[in-house]
């Protein structure tokens, strides 16, 4: 199975990416995680992106807040799918990061999840890898079924409370 590459712009993004890593681990997906800044370590970020395919990555996730140029900087240097996670920062509740991540020029796409959407970034990565991996697809189906069962259990409890 190909790996997922995870890059964060700062260690302040780590709490969000721990959820990403936990989700990938629960699905048996290998990953690597690094801190590279689009502004402070642009050469390292570029080198990571350029060599990602040769290093066995199938999908890349880039998380950053505020100016949030990391996902775009990674996407500019690879044709692998890049998923951007805009991270909530000290102002604007992450809307600044969301707009910086989603507003990419034509020809350099970045798939973008919600602000602080680390779990969905992992699940989107898994869905992409599952296109060619039936075992992973089955794990995703099982996860969705378990999530649905939890909702139905909560509904049953609510109905019992209201009608009981």
Question: Residue ranges of each PLM-predicted region?
Answer:
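Glycine-rich phosphate/diphosphate-binding loop of Rossmann-like nucleotide-binding domains
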Residues: 2-40
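Active-site nucleophile and cofactor-binding loops and adjacent substrate-binding regions
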Residues: 37-38, 63-67, 86, 112-117
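Glycine/charged-rich beta-loop-alpha catalytic/anionic-binding loops adjacent to active sites
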Residues: 2, 29-32, 79-80, 102-110
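Glycine-rich phosphate-binding loop
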Residues: 48-86
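N-terminal beta-loop-helix "entrance" segment that forms/cooperates
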Residues: 33-54
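Short glycine/serine/threonine-rich phosphate/pyrophosphate-binding segments
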Residues: 13-17, 41-45, 64-73, 92-95, ...
């Amino acid at each position: 199975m190909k790996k997922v590459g995870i890059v964060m712009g700062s260690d302040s993004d780590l709490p969000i990416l721990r959820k990403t890593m936990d989700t990938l681990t629960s699905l048996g997906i290998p990953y690597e995680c690094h801190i590279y800044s689009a502004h402070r370590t642009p050469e390292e970020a570029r080198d990571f992106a350029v060599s990602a395919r040769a290093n066995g990555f199938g999908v890349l996730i880039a998380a950053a807040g505020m100016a949030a140029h990391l996902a775009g900087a990674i996407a500019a240097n690879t044709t692998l799918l890049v998923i951007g996670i805009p991270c909530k920062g000290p102002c604007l509740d992450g809307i600044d990061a969301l707009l910086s991540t989603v507003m990419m020029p034509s020809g350099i796409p970045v798939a973008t999840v919600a602000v602080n959407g680390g779990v969905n970034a992992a699940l989107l990565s898994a869905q992409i890898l599952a296109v060619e991996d039936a075992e992973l697809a089955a794990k995703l189906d099982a996860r969705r079924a378990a999530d649905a069962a939890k909702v139905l259990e909560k509904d049953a409890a609510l109905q019992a409370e209201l009608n009981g």
